């Protein structure tokens, strides 16, 4: 099931900054629409988030560059 809005994302993802949530949602939807399982969609979506954001203590912050 595709996510239409960030508010529909799992609770763990909703704790991310809005930009990271959008990256996760768009990536998850793309992988899922290509026939990927939920687990594969989530794994690839987290990888996409981690390319642009990093965890600093308890917070996620945008990577420089």
Q: Predicted segment positions?
A:
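C-terminal alpha-helical interaction appendages
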Residues: 1-65
